[in-house]
Amino acid sequence: KQEKAEQEKAEQEKAEQEKAEQEKAEQERLAKLQAEQEKAEQERLARLQADKELPPVEDEQVQQAKAKVKEKETAKSSTAISKPIDVENSYKSMQLMAENSYKLIDMQQGQLRYLASATCSVGTEKACLSGFTHYQNIDKANAIQTGISGAYRFDINQTPLVVGLAIDSDSYSSLPTGYEYQGYPLPLIGFSVDLIPSLNPTSNGNALHLSLKGAYVNRKVTIKRPILDNTEAGKGHAKISGYYIDFQGYYPYTLNNLITVTPFAGLTFNQTSRSAYSETQGTKLAVHYQELNAHSLLAKIGLGIEYTVNAKLKLDSKAGLLWHLSHHQGDFQSHIDYLGQQKINYNDNKKQLAQRPFASVGLTYQLDKQSSVNTTTNWQMTPYRNQDIHMGIGYTYRF
């Protein structure tokens, strides 16, 4: 019995040992299989990752095509930028700008001069009011101005002193090429102070008369550069400002009941400027412009004639000469980005006139004792040989 028990125990231990070895072998096999599967999966994922990072051959061709297109666009862009950089045409464009700028200054000075003389005449009454309109032409640039004026008479030691005020606004304008008013232009303002002994009924009229007149302008303009080949149409904004002062003495002399001759002499000062500005639109290479200004002191001498056609109609004319006592016309200066400075002395193109003639003719029709209608045409040569012509009509009521 004891041997049989020991034999069964030995067989049981052997069976348990074989079972343990089988389980261990199975675990090792499963672990090895799992390791191989994990390794294979890692390799597969690595290949997928590599495939994502490396573009296919077709994508490389597309990228090469895109690169060529980009190079063409870059070359085209470079060409587009280089086109405006035409130094010769840019300089010609600046010359045109200079000529038109000086013409605008002449135009504004002409309007100031006209307004300073537009104050109504009180005649033998105490005060007057008038409305007027006039057309201006200066070398293809033109404008229509409409205004009102008023004057009042004071008697100082039996000598009539007449003080007047006038306002002139723009109704229509075609300014020199490249210029236009920005919005509605502010009106011009004028004044006059006249010492008129002949208005005293006790005087025979043959006495020295004195006159002080003036006008002021301040307006905003938009300026567009002339377009030439391989240049740009740059645009900017600036201000035009200036004033006009005229002082003269005149001596009316009555030849007979029909004709009065009036010699006159005086001094005139005017100043007009266009502010500095830079182009802000329509350009890649902006131009920067320095202030352009002009001022003159002139001596004036001339003769006026008034002819009484009948009780209602009078004809008057005037002619004279202006001498430049001093005159300054600033050089036209501009600076183009990457091209540098341009400086234009306008004297090189048009030599200014040291003596300038002027003339006018007018007609006054007396509607009744208190009201009249007058027309006037005047002409003057500007400093740079532009002909400034004004034609106007007005109505005056005295009271």
Where are these regions (language model features)?
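Solvent-exposed, glycine/polar-rich loop segments of beta-barrel outer-membrane systems
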Residues: 173-178, 220-237, 273-295, 326-353
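Outer membrane beta-barrel transmembrane domains
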Residues: 187-194, 289-399
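Outer-envelope exported proteins of Gram-negative bacteria
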Residues: 149, 164, 207-215, 260-268, ...
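Secondary-structure transition into beta-strands, especially the periplasmic turns and strand N-termini
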Residues: 199-208, 253-261, 307-317, 371
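Outer membrane beta-barrel translocator domains of Type V secretion systems
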Residues: 77-253, 378, 383, 390
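Long, low-complexity, compositionally biased polyampholytic IDRs enriched for Lys/Glu and Gln/Arg
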Residues: 2-67
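Membrane-proximal, glycine/serine-rich, low-complexity loop/turn segments characteristic
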Residues: 66, 71-79
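Intrinsic-disorder-driven secretion/translocation and chaperone-binding regions of pathogen effectors
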Residues: 49-64, 204-206, 256, 289, ...
